[in-house]
Amino acid sequence: MSEPVNKVKQTQQQVDDVTNTMHIAVGKMLDNQQKVSELTDKSENMKQGAQQFKKKTNEIKRLMWCRNIKLTLIIIAVVVLLLVVIIVPIVLKFT
Amino acid sequence: MSYVPLKQPLLEDDGSFDYEETLLSERNEQAKHLAQDIYHLKGAMDDLKMMVDEQGEMLVQADNNVTTADLEIEYGVEELEKAYVYKSRSKKRIIILVVVILLILAVVIGASIKFFVKK
């Protein structure tokens, strides 16, 4: 007669142990939820920062490229001017 | 003679029945308590599962954000390298420009000197 009572009490004790473990787990998950939320926010901020970094570097590249093109055009114009300055006297001498 | 034997078995049965009834009642209450605790345990497990799923989605989103940030930073670094290359070319072309301008000035000065000498 005492064995079924022990089984019920044993099962009750096991359920109590599991309940305590579940409560501890729920508490940890609540803490983790706050940490995960902060982590998501920080990763979102990092992503936005990376996007801005990408935009800025792209603008810098375009700026440098435009400067490069301008210098190229200026050099071409100056070289043409140099050639003109050299060729005109020669042509004048021949005529 | 027949009355006395009938009385004794009734007393014995009553005592045994009371004990068994008390035992069954206690066991029933314990079983109900056990079922109630298991029900609460199920509720806690459901809550835990919901939180795990939610945090899993948040972690996946965070991982995607980090991956995207990594790719964009790498792309940005490549852009910076290209910008540095263009800047270096610009410096070289500035030097070339200065040299060409000096050549033009030399030619113009030479022509001026010749012109003055002719006078």
Swiss-Prot record, chain A:
Keywords: Coiled coil, Cytoplasmic vesicle, Membrane, Transmembrane, Transmembrane helix. The chain crosses the membrane at residues 71-91. Residues 1-70 are cytoplasmic. Pfam families: Synaptobrevin. SUPFAM superfamilies: SNARE fusion complex. PANTHER family: SYNAPTOBREVIN FAMILY MEMBER. This is Synaptobrevin-A. It comes from Dictyostelium discoideum. The lineage of its organism: Eukaryota, Amoebozoa, Evosea, Eumycetozoa, Dictyostelia.
